[in-house]
């Protein structure tokens, strides 16, 4: 009964009864779980060598991985160098004097606290109080704080060290390959090829080729199957794995500089368990899947060492642009993708991603598996046009159409300096809950500089995969300069009441493509991770793009303190200046919870006494406060030209001095938009003039 069910003709995979068969018999009869019942002899290409185009694609992937590895090592090196400089510049002994600044501690000196990690004495200025579950406060010195930051930003906190990795060896390419006319019949016998060497235990040298190695390195049963389709080693890992594992190249020197890792990860039990778990999660190398090489007169083992059904499943980049018999075919197929796609990155947010929505899931992996492939490379039919290999590897292409689609519209109101984002609906979202549904919501960020200050979100809709929001989220204070350099990231997430919210998918749109005062509608398939297109970088892989984006976001967070919308009007009826504080946007977070308690202070200089100073109300726990308050200064119009208005934004704190967020100064001595705003106010009486001003980290007012 069991045999009848499993060997049904309608089943795609056939498993006969294996009770009377031994393991060797299964290999000879081509039976087992991995044997396809039809078309097996034509699809099996173990004796065919990889083409030069395929080898070039593999070499480009390896070069990208090495590039990312070098960038990761440089990034960690900068972190370590900064930490070492802090350690070298200590001025105290950590007992009677502060370990950092060297200030005297004790009864006659500053207050003393003990660092929780290094157990050294520091003053309260050089120590940082951290929150913990313990009832008493926990203090850390700035060196230990920096050490924890390095441990966190390098990813070593997860692995308790750095895992090792060995990159695949570059594939040798034979340039003087003889050509055969397509019209002549070619025998189907496989051509003999020189076996490929097995990967060494150390990292391979970039320039090593098959010709430079001796014949003694080409022995072993696994080496005879090198001309097979999948014999070039384990599949290349995704860029997200490469970013984590590439940091382990200099793990020994990093551990010595930090004193936090427990030696070589491969020598400790935890390191062995970690290495086993990492290797178990990856596909096994093709050379290990075939224990014996196939003989010319004997069919290959049922396991098949080919990594994909056809050439387009693994390498969708090799789309022939000329005839295969043309002498320039190799160069045309391997030309840089800048010439084919129009730039690094290769696609726009509104263009190609919409085209991808038309492809069914797994279209380019199953289409080539349906038809048998000829054995001879020169007579092979060109594969159907597919996407670039680098573009397909930049994100999870197999889930490009399974995450769902999002419909939204964008409108830039240039007169009011606002960006209106209308989230209409989503369709076919990926189920995230156990009931096969989701609780989706949409959140928006502006890149670079993503933070809570520019985060907007919709309401959450329960138990649906096809939500309809019809919500409009508005970004205020968006100038023409912001439209040229900002990118809008739209993320769809699943809300979880009892845990962390789960990410479903996202899409990004460069705001410089949006025309002012013209609404643009979008219906785009969600992607798991979308790389940013950056000019001047070769091989914009996902890991490199995210790393560059992380660097830009950190720079943006440091430079931008926020913006303030101010209105000025000189009233001839009241005989004075009316200053309106309308709102602030994208303020810097000053509190530990990631928010601020902002208020605005005004000071008309030179000093006119107490009547020259005004202050708004305090807005609690927000980075985008709305004040809508007006203040009146009784001053003659002729005297106003000699004055300057100082505007400062502060974070209110209880029990200590307020934190300065940023400010700006309007007056004759100002420059740019500030001077223009003040001049228009003096020129146009009884007319309210509103302007956005960038806050600067220049404090002109005391915190009292």
From Swiss-Prot:
Specifically expressed in brain. It is a peripheral membrane protein. GO terms for molecular function: calcium ion binding; calcium-dependent phospholipid binding; small GTPase binding; zinc ion binding. Residues 44-161 form the RabBD domain. The keyword Repeat applies. Residues 1-12 have a biased composition (Polar residues). Residues 291-310 have a biased composition (Pro residues). Transmembrane segments: none annotated. Zn(2+) 1 binds at residues 98, 101, 123, 126. Ca(2+) 3 binds at residues 549, 591, 597, 651-653. The modification Omega-N-methylarginine is found at residue 229. Keywords: Calcium, Cell membrane, Cell projection, Cytoplasmic vesicle, Lipid-binding, Membrane, Metal-binding, Methylation, Phosphoprotein, Postsynaptic cell membrane, Protein transport, Repeat, Synapse, Transport, Ubl conjugation, Zinc, Zinc-finger. Zn(2+) 2 binds at residues 115, 118, 141, 144. Pfam families: C2 (PF00168), FYVE_2 (PF02318). Residues 402-524, 560-693 form the C2 domain. Its main location: membrane. Plays an essential role in docking and fusion steps of regulated exocytosis. At the presynaptic level, RPH3A is recruited by RAB3A to the synaptic vesicle membrane in a GTP-dependent manner where it modulates synaptic vesicle trafficking and calcium-triggered neurotransmitter release. In the post-synaptic compartment, forms a ternary complex with GRIN2A and DLG4 and regulates NMDA receptor stability. Also plays a role in the exocytosis of arginine vasopressin hormone. Binds calcium via the C2 domains. The calcium-bound C2 domains mediate interactions with phospholipid bilayers. This is Rabphilin-3A. It comes from Bos taurus. The lineage of its organism: Eukaryota, Metazoa, Chordata, Craniata, Vertebrata.
């Amino acid at each position: 009964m069991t045999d009848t069910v499993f060997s049904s003709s309608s089943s795609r995979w056939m498993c006969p009864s294996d009770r009377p068969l031994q393991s060797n018999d299964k290999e000879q009869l081509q039976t087992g779980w991995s044997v396809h019942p039809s078309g097996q002899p034509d699809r099996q290409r173990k004796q065919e060598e990889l083409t030069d185009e395929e080898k070039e694609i593999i070499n480009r992937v390896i070069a990208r991985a090495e590039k990312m590895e070098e960038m990761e090592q440089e990034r960690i090196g900068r972190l370590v160098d900064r930490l070492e400089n802090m350690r070298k510049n200590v001025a105290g002994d950590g007992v009677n004097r502060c370990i950092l600044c060297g200030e005297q501690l004790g009864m006659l000196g500053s207050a003393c606290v003990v660092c929780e990690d290094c157990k050294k004495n520091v003053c309260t200025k050089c120590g940082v109080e951290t929150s913990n579950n313990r009832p008493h406060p926990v203090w850390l010195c700035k060196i230990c704080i920096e050490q924890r930051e390095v441990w966190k930003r390098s990813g070593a906190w997860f692995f308790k060290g750095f895992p090792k990795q060995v990159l695949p060896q570059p594939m040798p390419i034979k340039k003087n390959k003889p050509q055969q006319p397509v019209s002549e019949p070619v025998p189907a016998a496989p051509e003999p090829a020189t076996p490929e060497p097995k990967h060494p235990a150390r990292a391979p040298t970039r320039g090593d080729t098959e010709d430079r190695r001796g014949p003694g390195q080409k022995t072993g049963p696994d080496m005879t199957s090198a001309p097979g389709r999948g014999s070039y080693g384990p599949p290349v890992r995704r860029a997200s794995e490469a970013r984590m594992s590439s940091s382990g190249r200099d793990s020994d020197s990093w551990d010595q500089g930090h004193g936090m890792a427990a030696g070589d990860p491969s020598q400790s039990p935890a390191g062995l368990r970690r290495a086993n778990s990492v290797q178990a999660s990856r596909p096994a190398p093709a050379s290990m899947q075939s224990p014996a090489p196939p003989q010319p007169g004997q069919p290959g083992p049922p396991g098949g060492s080919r990594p994909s059904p056809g050439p387009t499943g693994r390498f969708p980049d090799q789309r022939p642009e000329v005839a295969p018999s043309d002498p320039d075919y190799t160069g045309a197929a391997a030309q840089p993708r800048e010439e084919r796609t129009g730039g690094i990155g290769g696609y726009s947010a509104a263009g190609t991603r919409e085209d991808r929505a038309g492809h069914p899931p797994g279209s380019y992996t199953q289409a080539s598996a349906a038809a048998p492939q000829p054995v001879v490379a020169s007579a092979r039919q060109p594969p159907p046009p597919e996407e670039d290999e680098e573009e397909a590897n930049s994100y999870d292409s197999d889930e490009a159409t399974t995450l769902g689609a999002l419909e939204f519209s964008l409108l830039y109101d240039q007169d009011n300096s606002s960006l209106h984002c209308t989230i209409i609906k989503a369709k076919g979202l990926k189920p995230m809950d156990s009931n096969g549904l989701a609780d989706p919501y949409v959140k928006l960020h502006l890149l670079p500089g993503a933070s809570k200050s520019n985060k907007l979100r919709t309401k959450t809709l329960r138990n649906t995969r096809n939500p309809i929001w019809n919500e409009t989220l508005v970004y205020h204070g968006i100038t023409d300069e912001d439209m040229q350099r900002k990118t809008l990231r739209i993320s769809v997430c699943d809300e979880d009441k009892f845990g962390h919210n789960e990410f479903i998918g996202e899409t990004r749109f460069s705001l410089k493509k949006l025309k002012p005062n013209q609404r643009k509608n979008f219906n785009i398939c969600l992607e798991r991770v979308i790389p940013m297109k950056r000019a001047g970088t070769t091989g914009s892989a996902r890991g490199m793009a995210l790393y560059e984006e992380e660097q830009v976001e950190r720079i943006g967070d440091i430079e931008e303190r926020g913006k303030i919308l101010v209105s000025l009007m000189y009233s001839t009826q009241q005989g004075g200046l009316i200053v309106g504080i309308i709102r602030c946007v994208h303020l810097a977070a000053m509190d530990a919870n990631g928010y601020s308690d902002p208020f605005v202070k005004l000071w008309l200089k030179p000093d006119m006494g107490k009547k020259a100073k005004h202050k708004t109300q305090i807005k609690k726990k927000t980075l985008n406060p709305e004040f809508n308050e007006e203040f009146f200064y009784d001053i003659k119009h002729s005297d106003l030209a000699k004055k300057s208005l100082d505007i400062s934004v502060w974070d209110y704190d209880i029990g200590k001095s307020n934190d300065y967020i940023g400010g700006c100064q309007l007056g004759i001595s100002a420059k740019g938009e500030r001077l223009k705003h003040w001049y228009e106010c003096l020129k146009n009486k009884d007319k309210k003039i509103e302007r956005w001003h960038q806050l600067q980290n220049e404090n002109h007012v005391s915190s009292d």
